[in-house]
Amino acid sequence: MSQSYQHILVAIDESPISYAAVEQAKCLAQDLQAKLTIMSVIAVDPFVGVDFYKVAPAITDYFMQAESHAQNRLNEIQANLARENLSAQVKLIRGVTPSEGIIHVADEVGADLIMMGSHGRTGLQKLMLGSVAQNVLTQSPIPVLIVKA
């Protein structure tokens, strides 16, 4: 049984492997004439509700800068794809875990394939935060294609 995907969702972070996923998705979308959505998640702020948060405006600035940087990167990817005559929608989700955000957006846009890098974080961050790719693989009701470096 062959599957022809109609709408591909690509989840990115700041890792080089996620940009490789965009390149793979671009080729697949062109071959299949599929819609393409590129997304990023600004995760739940771990300092919400902590007294320290009130005295640390730098933390608020950090999240505002992270959001601005993510939106700029999405816009840059969208513009690069447009130069190659490929239209892509971009989405930035805030305040949820990455895996929840990815699955939510896939449902929201009607994606029938999720593409993402095999990992974004390494070392202790990966251990503490868990594997986003593994969580999406486990929870997604649609196929997930993991891109390796």
What spans do the regions from the language model cover?
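Hydrophobic alpha-helical membrane-association signature
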Residues: 21, 70-73, 98
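Gly/Ser-rich helix-loop-strand patches that form or flank binding pockets
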Residues: 27, 104-149
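Residue-level recognition of beta-strand->loop/alpha-helix junctions
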Residues: 40, 92-94, 148
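Short, well-ordered secondary-structure micro-motifs
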Residues: 21, 48-51, 100-103, 126-128
